[in-house]
Amino acid sequence: MTQLIITHQSDSKLEESEVFLSELNRIKKEEDKFGKFSSLSDLRAIVKKGEFRIVSIYLSSGSILGEIFTFEFLKEFYGVLDFGSVLKVNILALDSIDKVKAFERNLLFSGFIKVKKLKGDGLNSSDSDFEIVIKAEKPSWKPEEGKVLVDDIDLEGSVPDIKNYVPLGQGKESCKSKERACNNCNCGRADLEKEIGVEAARKVYQEKVETGTARSSCGNCYLGDAFRCSGCPYKGMPAFKPGEKVSLANAEGDANDHTVDMNLIHEEKVDLITTTFDDDGSGVNNVQSKGGVLKLNI
């Protein structure tokens, strides 16, 4: 593969280096092309003389690197190279690492990819005496070759049908779908199961939900989901005011909603009063504080 070796016209110190002179002798033997440039137009003319997959630039110091290969220069030089070309910059003596970092950054900003700094590794031999080699590549693809992916996207199929949307609050946990009351039940179903049995209580509660006769036993239903119990039939509905009429959907998501009257539950602590009868039939009332709670619909 033919390579292009170029130097800058003003870099006289490079020709005094024995390392570079040995590189020139190698170029003559391998029939690589050599040229000098003083401006971007000269460099463009040299590159266009042939198809070079590798363009190698030799510099005597990093100071020339910062003076010549500016961002504007590299941006124009990027357009001169063929797609897939490799650029290598060989520096004989490095005087400032900051200039090398700035050069690498300008290479990336100009469009080059795979920018690497190979310290102590020359272009064609591992025992090269060049202090640093910077390698970069011009992409093998053109920007206009990109494919527009929007043509492959099925917009109609990617957007769900609005008819299949699940209304807010549906799918929440509900007592209607359960065989028994929750372990921490506070809606009254657990007490109802103790009185009339599990199956009978389930039917009663289901009927209350479907007919809209359910009543709050915790007093928190109107506050919103953050205060409602897990089996609350009002789960998923917005908060409302006590005594306000609200639309309550059953647990199956039936469209036939029911209007129910939401009553506020008031709780008061009560004492247990027992009466003890003597032999003569007279009774004595005993008051015991059990900390019980009486729930009333207001």
Swiss-Prot record:
It is found in: Cytoplasm; Mitochondrion intermembrane space. Pfam families: CIAPIN1 (PF05093). Residues 175-187 are annotated as: Fe-S binding site A. A motif (Cx2C motif 1) lies at residues 218-221. [4Fe-4S] cluster binds at C218, C221, C229, C232. A motif (Cx2C motif 2) lies at residues 229-232. One of its GO terms (cellular component) is mitochondrial intermembrane space. Keywords: 2Fe-2S, 4Fe-4S, Cytoplasm, Iron, Iron-sulfur, Metal-binding, Mitochondrion. Its cofactor is [2Fe-2S] cluster; [4Fe-4S] cluster. Residues 143-162 are annotated as: Linker. InterPro entries: Anamorsin, CIAPIN1. The keyword Nucleotide-binding does not apply. One of its GO terms (molecular function) is 2 iron, 2 sulfur cluster binding. [2Fe-2S] cluster binds at C175, C182, C185, C187. The keyword tRNA-binding does not apply. Residues 218-232 are annotated as: Fe-S binding site B. GO terms for biological process: iron-sulfur cluster assembly. Residues 1-143 are annotated as: N-terminal SAM-like domain. Monomer. The C-terminal domain binds 2 Fe-S clusters but is otherwise mostly in an intrinsically disordered conformation. Component of the cytosolic iron-sulfur (Fe-S) protein assembly (CIA) machinery. Required for the maturation of extramitochondrial Fe-S proteins. Part of an electron transfer chain functioning in an early step of cytosolic Fe-S biogenesis, facilitating the de novo assembly of a [4Fe-4S] cluster on the cytosolic Fe-S scaffold complex. Electrons are transferred from NADPH via a FAD- and FMN-containing diflavin oxidoreductase. Belongs to the anamorsin family. This is Anamorsin homolog.
